[in-house]
A protein has these predicted regions:
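Noncatalytic N-terminal accessory/assembly modules of large enzymes
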Residues: 1-129
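Conserved ATP-binding subdomain of kinase catalytic cores across diverse folds
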Residues: 89, 96-291
């Protein structure tokens, strides 16, 4: 067993070396586009750009974190944030009895007709989004009886730092977390979605919001995405999703993933230095006090 684990880790290490080289080349080609990311006019453009900056930075502790086992070179360029791709989602029409939804689907979901399906299916089936990379392996993992694969894809998305969570291009307040048949941070960490976890984020959200109502000072310190909506087919980890809706009051905000703070800029500075210069008049001490407060 130990030899098998070592062989798996060696394979992961080889993948990490290969992917690191590809991502380094992507950084050399595209980094200048991100040098003025804080000047982008829309909050979502700033967020997705900072996510992309963070994607070029290796994990601080896990030596082979760069490996996305299950992504070949083509898939990496099509679906990883380092390459800033844009793609459409695939869709399944599942029998209503086979799919559990935590709430009504978002209004911007595509129609059955748009997906090339008969409109009459709307009464008997419900749509479930699928990542294009997972789409290719669906039969291998199984589908509920009566499931129909939509002939057309729909909804343009861009990958965030987490890779399996994507931002809806035309509705950037909406992010969708999707299962991916890819392993990261170890051969056993397959990036699927356990159905029971669909409800964890919403529970945490409502708990924090309840605390905020009791403590106004606490409530002024954070905003929380709405994670009420999600769906899953029975206990199938490859047939699930979580929809996250960002608050509407983000128009002038700049959201900064912590993972992006130490990202290098083309001019040699760290991103946190640019951030401090823009919002704290260059005072790292003031920024640090705010960050730790």
């Amino acid at each position: 067993a130990s030899l098998e684990l070592f062989a798996a880790y060696r394979k992961e290490a080889d993948c990490a070396v290969h992917h690191r080289a590809l991502c380094h080349a992507a950084y050399q080609e595209h980094a200048t586009e991100l040098s003025d990311i804080l000047d982008k006019p829309a909050w979502d453009q700033r967020l997705i750009g900072i996510d992309r900056l963070a994607s070029y930075l290796d994990h601080p502790y896990y030596p082979t974190a760069r490996a996305k086992s299950g992504f070949d070179s083509t898939a990496l360029k099509r679906y990883a944030p380092e390459f800033a791709p844009r793609f459409k989602l695939n869709w399944l029409a599942l029998p209503n009895a086979a799919l559990t939804l935590s709430s009504s689907p978002p209004k911007h979901w595509p129609s059955f007709v748009e997906l090339g399906l008969k409109q009459s299916l709307e009464t008997s089936h419900t749509l479930l989004p699928v990542h294009p990379l997972t789409w290719l392996e669906l039969e291998k993992y199984g589908l509920p009886e009566g499931t129909i694969k939509a002939p057309h894809s729909a909804m343009d998305v861009e990958p965030t730092l987490s890779v399996r969570t994507v931002m809806c291009v035309e509705r950037p307040h909406w992010h969708i977390k999707l299962p991916l048949l890819v392993t990261t941070l170890g051969a056993r960490n397959l990036r699927l979605i356990k159905p029971s976890t669909l409800y964890d984020g919403h529970w945490f959200q409502t708990t924090l919001q309840a605390l905020a109502k009791r403590d106004p000072q606490l409530g002024m310190r954070y905003l929380h995405v709405d994670e009420e909506h999600g769906g899953h087919a029975d206990e199938s980890r490859h047939l699930a999703y979580i929809a996250r809706h960002y608050p509407g009051e983000l128009g002038v905000a700049t959201l900064v993933p912590v993972a992006g703070l130490a990202s290098p800029l083309p001019d040699g500075r760290l991103f946190v230095e640019q951030l401090v210069e823009r919002f704290y008049q260059g005072s790292l001490q003031r920024w640090l006090e705010d960050y730790l407060d």
